[in-house]
Structures are given as C-alpha cells and as structure tokens.
Amino acid sequence: MNVSKPEQRTLHALAQGGHIAFLRDASGKITRVECYNRDGHLLLDCTLAVFSRLKNKGLVHSRQGRPYRISMAGLKAVRPQADNR
C-alpha cells in the first residue's frame, strides 16, 4: 500500500502508543485533529488531510467515541523506523 511520508510518520507515532484526538463542529463533522505520541507531544505532520487519507484507507479507527488509534491494517502498513530514545 502506498503511504506518504506524513502518513508514515503519523502511523509510526500511533504504532508506538500515540493517538489522534479530534474536534467536531455542531453538525458532528470532524473539523480539527491533533496527533499525540506516547509521551504526549504533538505531531505537526498530522493534518486533517492526512487523517482523512488514513481513515479512508482503514489504517486508523475509533471505538465508542474514543481517540483514533492505529488498526491492524495500519500496523501491517507501517514501515519500521529506528527509535532513538
């Protein structure tokens, strides 16, 4: 599956335990997203456009109104990266 660099960065942060928080307008449409890594830092590469592409590809999912997390398809699509912790 073709995954762009911003999508890959977002998936990598989610695979390590991050989540995508979202804000909805009065009609229920998602208007803003914020991607946090496991340490609580904000990832700037995660825009609304990147989020919608990940959601349309089925790489992230949300259950019962909770923040979006990586799905099994997302775990399979993410490429390994070195973690310099």
From Swiss-Prot:
Q: Name one Pfam family in it.
A: YjhX_toxin
The name this protein carries in UniProt is UPF0386 protein PA0712
Record-stated family:
Belongs to the UPF0386 family.
HAMAP family, per database record: UPF0386 (MF_00827)
Q: Which NCBIfam families match?
A: PRK13687.1
Coiled-coil portions: none
